[in-house]
Every structure is written in C-alpha cells, then in structure tokens.
A protein has these predicted regions:
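Amphipathic alpha-helical segments
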Residues: 1-2
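Intrinsically disordered, low-complexity regions enriched in serine/threonine
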Residues: 13-181
Length: 181
C-alpha cells in the first residue's frame, strides 16, 4: 500500500510449483487513476523467498464501480495468467542452463545500473554484484543467468514494497534480452 493509500501492490502465492519455485500472481491497483487493476504472473523462489515476474501487468477489463467484484476480476485474471506458467517455467529452466562468464555478468550489471537499461535505483548495483559473486545460498553458486536473476531480486528486497514490485516486474524482460555468453 502506498503511503497515501491510493496505490496497492500485492502477491498471491499459488499452490502450483516446480523445482524450488512456486507460481504467484502479482496484483496492482490505483484509486488515484494512475493505473487500473492489473495482474501479472510470477514466481517465488523457495530458498530465499525472492519474487520474479514475467511481463507487464495486464489490465483486468473492469472499471471501478458499485457493481465491481474484486473476486470475479481476480478469478478472470488468474485464469489468464495461468497461460503464462509454462513459458515462465521454460524461461527459468533456460536461465538455469545458461552459463555466464564473470565478464558477461559484470556487463549485465553495468548495463542495468550504469547505462540505466533497467529502471531501478543505482545504489543497488553493489548489492547485486556482491550477491552474484558471493551468493548467500548454495542454489545460486552456479554462474548462471538464474543466479544473476536471483542476485537482482535479492537486492530488490532493500526497496520499499511498491518500488520492489516495479523493479521485479521489469527484470524478466531486461534479462531476457541479454545474449547468451
């Protein structure tokens, strides 16, 4: 919830899981007309509780009115998001298999923060670097895109909830554009 109570971001953890991850639905809403109720598919990593999202938030086709049902809107949104489960699982498997050289990892971090290819606070660059090259969890020891993704999402935990959700929602697209090294 934003400080003024006009914007809300949240996560629904789902029962569907695979190899150390549980699917989740990211939800946002703005009563200040900044954005409509929208959902995106994501996942939560069991070992560290990191959140990662796939794609942008998709609006739920409903206007705020006295007849609006949040339960119905979320039901429709969850149904739509389930179509992204398999592509997201495949992306994770691809990232787990995608080896990164130290140079490629450093260049990706540089592009994210110094060249501002990822809209996130620059002060997180050092945290991402440290979390990738000195991982806190054994699962992230391999030098892969998956480990780098989790370094980013772990660093994002330093942010307040709303900026954390925004950063997490943009990360997948950014990392998806990184060429294999």
């Amino acid at each position: 919830m934003s400080k003024d109570g006009m914007e809300m971001f949240g996560v629904l953890d789902l029962e569907t899981s695979f190899e150390g991850c549980r699917f989740a639905i990211g939800i946002r809403n703005g009563n200040n007309k900044r954005f409509r109720l929208a959902c995106t598919v994501g996942l939560r990593v069991f070992v560290c509780h990191n959140l990662a999202f796939r794609g942008d938030y998709s609006p739920v086709l409903a206007k705020h009115s006295k007849h609006f049902s949040l339960e119905d809107a979320l039901s429709i949104g969850v149904d739509r998001m389930q179509r992204n489960f398999e592509p997201m699982r495949q992306q994770v498997e691809g990232w787990r298999a995608q080896q990164l050289s130290a140079t490629a990892a450093k260049l990706t971090i540089y592009r994210a923060f110094i060249e501002a290819d990822l809209e996130v606070p620059r002060h997180l660059a050092r945290s991402v670097h440290e979390l990738y090259f000195n991982p806190q969890h054994e699962e992230f020891q391999p030098r892969t895109m998956w480990s780098l993704s989790n370094a980013f999402t772990s660093a994002f935990k330093e942010l307040d909830p709303i900026p954390q959700f925004r950063a997490s929602a943009k990360l997948g697209k950014f990392l998806g554009a990184v060429p294999a090294s």
